[in-house]
């Protein structure tokens, strides 16, 4: 009897790529299962370029992502309270072979022009290395802007500033990013972005986002550095909201 499976459609991939895809699928299924069992529904954080919106008052999201080559996993959560409807607060934890980093985050609404489809916010984050003697690793400030150009198309623009410790050296750089979201159907959105730092790294990412109802999204993202060794990567993520 011939055995069929989801991965049988990807037999043309090299064995190493098949193993990576299998791990990514297991990660997605596990994340969704944990989220559903805990009645938590999270929002997608696999992309770098932010939008100009914040959660509605009383709404929270939890994001999870796994990147292969270089290996990295992330988990984040954010909420907007009814008492402070213009402020979203949260935290992210990122784990890779070199370190584990905790990042408290704040994001606030600056201005919205609903008739023109424009939203502007401010965002701030601090980065703390939890397994290092000197834990403070840097901070980011940014201004994300979103323009709903059409019902199916959103454009995002980010400008900001980053302060980081690179191998003990302090660096301050301007940061930027551009992104677009094109909704093909109720269940599918295509995303692409390019982002970078002044005199630093630059990269792009793109991929589909599957909408499993109104509360669950799944991302499959490919990316590549545009500087240095031009690494490539594959990221899978799950977005759940409540």
Describe the residue ranges of each PLM region.
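Cleavable N-terminal export/targeting peptides
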Residues: 1-47
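Transmembrane beta-barrel domains of Gram-negative outer membranes and organellar outer membranes
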Residues: 41-242
């Amino acid at each position: 009897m011939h055995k069929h499976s989801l991965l049988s459609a990807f037999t043309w991939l090299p064995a190493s790529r098949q193993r990576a895809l299998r791990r990514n699928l297991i990660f997605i299924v596990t994340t969704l299962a944990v989220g559903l069992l805990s009645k938590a529904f999270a929002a997608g954080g696999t992309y770098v370029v932010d939008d100009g919106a914040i959660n509605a008052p009383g709404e929270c999201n939890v994001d999870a992502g796994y990147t292969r080559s270089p290996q990295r996993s992330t988990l984040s959560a954010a909420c907007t309270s009814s008492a402070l409807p213009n402020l979203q607060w949260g935290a992210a934890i990122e784990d890779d072979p070199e370190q584990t980093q905790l990042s408290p985050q704040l994001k606030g609404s600056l201005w919205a022009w609903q008739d023109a489809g424009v939203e502007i916010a401010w965002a701030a984050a601090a980065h703390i290395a939890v397994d290092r003697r000197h834990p403070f690793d840097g901070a980011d400030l940014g201004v994300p802007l979103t323009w709903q150009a059409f019902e199916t198309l959103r454009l995002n623009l980010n400008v900001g500033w980053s302060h980081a410790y690179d191998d003990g050296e302090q660096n301050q750089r301007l940061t930027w990013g551009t992104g677009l979201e094109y909704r093909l159907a109720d269940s599918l959105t295509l995303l692409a972005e390019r982002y970078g730092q002044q005199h630093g790294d630059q990269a792009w990412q793109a991929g589909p986002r599957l909408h499993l109802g109104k509360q669950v999204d799944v991302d499959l993202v490919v990316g590549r550095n545009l500087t240095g060794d031009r690494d490539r990567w594959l990221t899978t993520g799950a977005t759940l909201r409540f």
